[in-house]
Every structure is written in C-alpha cells, then in structure tokens.
Amino acid sequence: MEEHDYDSNSNPPLMSTYKHLFVEQHRLDMDMGAIDVDECELPVIDLAGLMEAEQVCRADMVRAASEWGFFQVTNHGVPQALLRELHDAQVAVFRRPFQEKVTERLLGFSPESYRWGTPTAKCLEQLSWSEAYHIPMTTPRPSTSIRARAVIEEVSRAMYELAQKLAEILMRGLPGAGEGETMVTTREETCFLRLNRYPPCAMAMGGFGLCPHTDSDLLTIVHQQQDTVGGLQLLKGGRWVAVKPSPSTLIVNVGDLLQAWSNDVYKSVEHRVMANATLERFSMAFFLCPSYHTLIIPSSSHVHDDDAHYRSFTFGEYRKQIMEDVRSTGRKIGLHRFRTR
C-alpha cells in the first residue's frame, strides 16, 4: 500500500473532538504567518570517526550539543533494512481503523499505548495534530509471535545501546570531566520508543503536528524514513529553522536532564513539528531516561556548588512537576521550575 493511499477511517477524530478550540484559529494564523522559516543543515557526526579519529569525533559531538542541541549521526550501526522494516510496520498499524487502535491490542500492545491529540489542550496552540504509540522498553511480550513486534524490540534495543554510548561521550566531554566521572545511570524501565503519525491537516496554516516543546529526558534519537515530507523545526538564534529529512541518518537531540546535568553547557532546544496540509508524516523517536530515583545535580567535577544553575532534583520529581503544570496550565514549564540562577 502506498503511503498516500489510506482510508480516512484510520484518522483520529481530531477536528470534531477539538472543534471548541477553533475559535482561536485566527490568532494561530497570524502568529504562524509572521514566522519566516529557513531550512538548516544540522551538524553531521560520522560515528566511524570513533574508531579512526576518536578525539576529533568526540569534540565535534560536544560542540554540536553545545551550540545546536541537535545533530545528525551517520554510520550509527542501526541497519537501514531494520529501520525500513520498522517504518513499514508503523505505516501498517496506523492504517488500521481508528476504533481498532483505541480498543484492540494491536501488535500485542494495550489500547492505552495508543494516544492521539492533546487532551489537556486549552487553546489551539497547545493541540498536537498527531497520533502515536508509546512503547516502554519493558512492555511484556505477547503470547504469540508477531514479526512487527520483534522489529520494534530490535530497534528499541539498538537505539538504547546507541543512546547510552552518545550520552556517555557527551558527559565525559564536559570541561573537567574525566574517565572517573560519575555518569547518570539509565534504566530500560523508563526508556521508551514512540511511533508517530501526523495526519494531513487542512487548517489554513497547517497547524502543529507536535507543539513547541523540549524533551524531558537525557537524550532523544529520531528517525524518519520518508525523504519527501518535512515538518521538524527547531529554535536557533531566536528563529525557527526547518530540518531537512534524511533517511540515512539519525537525528540526536539533548534533553532537559542532560542540560541540567551539564549546567547549561548542553542545550535542550525547543522544537516542533508542523503538519502538512495534504501529506501524512511518520517518524520514530527513542527517549533515553534514568530511573525515577536518579538525582540530577550539576555538582560533579566540572561544576562548583556555588556555580550550579539548578537545584538538585530526581527524574521522578521532574516528571511529576511537568504533569502538574500541564494539568493546570495546558503546557510544560520544565527546567525553569528548578533553576536557581
């Protein structure tokens, strides 16, 4: 089945569910229409350099995380054939009728794994025009063998190992950090893969496929198999810039926890996805997270206590604060809640 050949019954009822928010449409049009978005070239890190020119490769990665908060990696070790197979499985499951996605255990996942729209949205600017499967790494396997499910698990494992390697490089790359530096310990129980689909959005200015946000993890890895449908944008120098899709690379971005741990050396950059008026977009994202009890505190060898920009907090405390803010305001406030200077 071609990607543009789908039954509209597979789409979540976004327009009818959130019609009460569309009184804000004129303001969204004006806000988005005033933004001139240029296309950017993200820094590209060839991970083959870790074997051939290790120090140069590590320095390039540290520079990209500091200056951009985003970078692409090539020769990352995740087979392209596996990523294509994941994309095909992703397209197939999102093609299923909406009612099946919300009620049945597709691919052996509970219906609660399927999410769509933004239930907490209080205005149109907070609505994400998307649907997704949120898949924790430790999700129990189904009793029957499902090839697509096995592919998801293979990709999750490969992404977890890659993300751990990249996070360690960045942690050890901070000024004053050495081989004895204490690392933030990650846990499979809190890491997850998210399969995204952004349906076509017929609103005048397209709308947000995913609202502007930063990631609440240590590190995120994103892949998009399509090379013809863009949409990912990040904030650079006070302006939104568009990221050109590249199926052969993986996009890596710094999360809030790594920004806090690095004492603002690395940047968790605000980013968003713009929905397309006529084309659907698919992507995959892996989120590297620590245990809920892990203490995030910028007081390791590279930071004196008096110079710390944040008070110490656990990942569990951070998540709880975010959920409270989203419930009360409709949006995430994030690191500002924990900043001391």
UniProtKB/Swiss-Prot annotation:
Keyword tags: Cytoplasm, Dioxygenase, Iron, Metal-binding, Nucleus, Oxidoreductase
Top-rank taxon: Eukaryota
Co-factor(s): L-ascorbate; Fe(2+)
Pfam families assigned: 2OG-FeII_Oxy, DIOX_N
SUPFAM superfamilies from the UniProt entry: Clavaminate synthase-like (SSF51197)
Binding locations of Fe cation: H213, D215, H271
Catalytic activity: gibberellin A1 + 2-oxoglutarate + O2 = gibberellin A8 + succinate + CO2
Designated name of the protein: Gibberellin 2-beta-dioxygenase 5
Species this chain originates from: Oryza sativa subsp. japonica
